[in-house]
Amino acid sequence: MLLLLILADDFTGALDTGVQFAACGIPTRVVVGEQVDFAANDAAVLVVDTETRHLSAAKAYAVIAKLTREAMSAGVFSIYKKTDSALRGNIGAELSALLKTSGERRLPFLPAFPQIDRVTRDGVHYISGVPVTESPFGIDPFEPVRHARVTELIGEQTDVPAYSFPTLKEGEAVPEQEGILVFDAGSLGDLASTGRALFRNGRPRLMAGCAGFAALLPDLMKMPGRRTVTMPKLLSLIHISEPTRLQLIS
């Protein structure tokens, strides 16, 4: 039974999110492209690499809207829009496509990945202690990130309202504003606290974030799986990003 659909905009993102579930022994499948047979899926978690990272905002919107529509028609309840932890790609267009097509009122978005020092404070996204626009991602040769304030970045591509909120305390009510709700997180504990608040009244239909928050979903969603899994020991990666190279060296 499909418990969760994850929409990632590139192959790396699909894998680094899918592994959060596979590592817990949860049946996980990764597919590439927008032609997906949801009825034929036999995994608990389906990760779709939509290949929309480098498309125009309009084309990316269309792909996410199509997949959202088809997934809901097939009975998929929960959808997670996986975003880049450095805020690259068509984030505003894709979040708005998911929200508008679903008919839901709000979409909680937790962009932080504190496990690798990417955090959100007072609505501003930081990479290794500096605003993302001042990090290497701000001078990316293909997709420089132009806004560190997450709501401003979202607003570049959509008219859907976006609001910034501090970390939710466990038991705290989810804000009632309709639109995209961006939550701060400076630690894994912050992500977990907001996650528990979001799940307090049941499983959300829509969620968004990077692999950081996705790592908490197996427990938040109470997904069945084996907790001890043998993983391969060899990793081969080619990447132009200096932060990625330094992570591998360390």
Regions found by a protein language model. Give the residues of each.
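Short, structured active-site "lid" loops
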Residues: 45-58
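N-terminal signal-anchor module of multipass membrane proteins
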Residues: 5-25, 52
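Short gly/pro/ser/thr-enriched loop/turn and capping motifs at secondary-structure boundaries
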Residues: 36-38, 114-118, 213-216
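Single conserved hydrophobic/aromatic residue that forms the stacking wall/gate
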Residues: 238-250
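Cap/lid and interdomain-hinge subdomains that line or gate substrate/regulatory clefts
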Residues: 1-3, 27, 31, 44, ...
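Soluble secreted/lumenal catalytic domains
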Residues: 23, 202-204, 235
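Short glycine/serine/threonine-rich phosphate/pyrophosphate-binding segments
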Residues: 13-17, 90-91, 191, 216
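Short, flexible loop segments at boundaries between secondary-structure elements
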Residues: 210-234
